[in-house]
Amino acid sequence: MSGWPHRHVLDLASFSREDFAAVLELAQRFRSLPITGARKLPALQGRLVATLFFEPSTRTRSSFELAAKRLSADVMSFSPSSSSLSKGESVLDTARTYVAMGADVLVVRHRSTGVPQQLAHDLQQMGERTVVLNGGDGLHSHPSQGLLDLLTLARFFSPRHPMPEALQGRRIVIVGDILHSRVARSNLWALSACGADVVLCGPPSLVPDDFAAFVDAPPPGLPEDPVPQRGKVSVVRRLEHALPGADAVMTLRLQKERMGQQLLTSLERYHRDFGLSHERMQLCGQNVPVLHPGPVNRGVELSGSLLDDPRCSLVEEQVRNGVPTRMALLYLMAASESAAEASLVSSSS
């Protein structure tokens, strides 16, 4: 695992297909631990993982903390309501406090875009070896969610060999609030890297036309795309035109807390035009799964009966895949850091 190339995990745009394969392979192995009877591994014993969540979270925070504990790491949790932020302490100074207490990994979530990247840069400039893992920042990225969604789809399409090639040539439809979704952005990088064609569906106010070119060029700061040939991204306005031929459908929560202006006439009209139901899913054909990163607005993004139907809903499967996926990320980052420390000791001796 010493070949893992990422000191920090801040987005998925910099991931090669080999990087995705490394995460999926490990996550699949970790997912089988309860079956073998092993609940914990000593991989991160003696390491300290701090979860700095400046924004509310249920699934991401809980699964990162459980992932760290299953790898035998010590875990510290940060809560804004009981911190010194209310006294004027900066995000950087808060992070430095945890670094001073020995944190090896900071899992950072913040409502503002770019905070994990800035922390990683500032800590590195200070000579700190603590690594930063983005737990979701603003509208930018949610790497671990994109990876667990990838694992969920790969396991569905190829249960015996859930690797990136299971997505090659698949047509994945993502419906809803793309504009405000860091999950959608992470999935665009992940799915296209694995050769899937992604269809984005929603009203122009939530799915601007320029999203069709989202993965056409690497983002600023990344000199070149690590994926030689990506799947295509397209924008379709009507759900009945997007669903036929789909291999899987992901619907996204309407992020009303991020909508500064009136982008929808009503939730009822949104559900009428873009809400998923058993009837609508018949347009896809047989055995087409539905995903949702949660939390779900029942009766808005999809019907309650569809959400609760184990024959087609993979929502609980996504939750189950969260812990092993985040275990894989923590393991890879720790292995990379151990290799870097060994190299540093060797060069100084």
Swiss-Prot record:
Its EC number is 2.1.3.2. One of its GO terms (biological process) is amino acid metabolic process. Pfam families: OTCace, OTCace_N. L-aspartate binds at K87, R182, R253. It catalyses: carbamoyl phosphate + L-aspartate = N-carbamoyl-L-aspartate + phosphate + H(+). Pathway: Pyrimidine metabolism; UMP biosynthesis via de novo pathway; (S)-dihydroorotate from bicarbonate: step 2/3. One of its GO terms (cellular component) is cytosol. GO terms for molecular function: amino acid binding; aspartate carbamoyltransferase activity. Keywords: Pyrimidine biosynthesis, Transferase. Signal peptide: none annotated. Carbamoyl phosphate binds at R59, T60, R109, H142, Q145, G294, P295. Catalyzes the condensation of carbamoyl phosphate and aspartate to form carbamoyl aspartate and inorganic phosphate, the committed step in the de novo pyrimidine nucleotide biosynthesis pathway. Belongs to the aspartate/ornithine carbamoyltransferase superfamily. ATCase family. Heterododecamer (2C3:3R2) of six catalytic PyrB chains organized as two trimers (C3), and six regulatory PyrI chains organized as three dimers (R2). This is Aspartate carbamoyltransferase catalytic subunit. It comes from Synechococcus sp. (strain CC9605). The gene is pyrB.
